[in-house]
A protein has these predicted regions:
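Structured alpha/beta or helical-core interaction and ligand-binding surfaces enriched in interleaved
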Residues: 1-141
Length: 141
């Protein structure tokens, strides 16, 4: 097999494991009770950063919590999206960043899954407006 064929095969390879999935940029899961969720002025996400060596195990925990209706919606960057980067990001969404009780509840669910290190929460409105760094609203917990 020539190099071009192997590269095409690799780039089109699908895997349930984010660290090996080159078929798409993100894998996503929605809870059974989740309706339509769209990024907008009130949505936001907890961001979990993981190296390629740990992302599959971390994503398995998040998927299980989403499918069990303990979390609303989540996505993970795949090998395709993470090429040239230090690792992966898992985003765990909430509907309304102004609902502090829900933000902290979701954070506690993540803590119960073993994500005990400090995490950051980012509003989608800042991402959509390309506001980064000191000008973005960012919660750490």
């Amino acid at each position: 097999m020539n190099k071009q064929s192997r590269l095409e095969e690799l780039l089109l390879s699908w895997s349930e494991r984010p660290s090996e999935d080159f078929s798409r940029s993100w894998q996503m899961r929605k809870s059974p009770s989740c309706g339509i969720i769209r990024s907008g002025p009130t949505t936001g996400k907890w961001c979990i950063f993981a190296p390629s060596s740990d992302v599959d195990q971390a994503w398995a925990k998040i998927k299980c919590a989403v499918e069990g209706d303990n979390l609303l919606f989540a996505k993970v960057s795949t090998a395709l999206r993470s090429m040239g980067r230090d690792g992966h990001v898992i985003c765990v969404y909430t509907q309304d960043w102004t609902d502090k009780q829900d933000l902290l509840h979701v954070r506690e669910v993540l803590r119960s899954l073993g994500f005990v290190d400090e995490l950051g929460y980012k509003r989608d409105i800042d991402t959509l407006k390309r506001i980064y760094g000191p000008d973005e609203w960012y919660l750490r917990a």
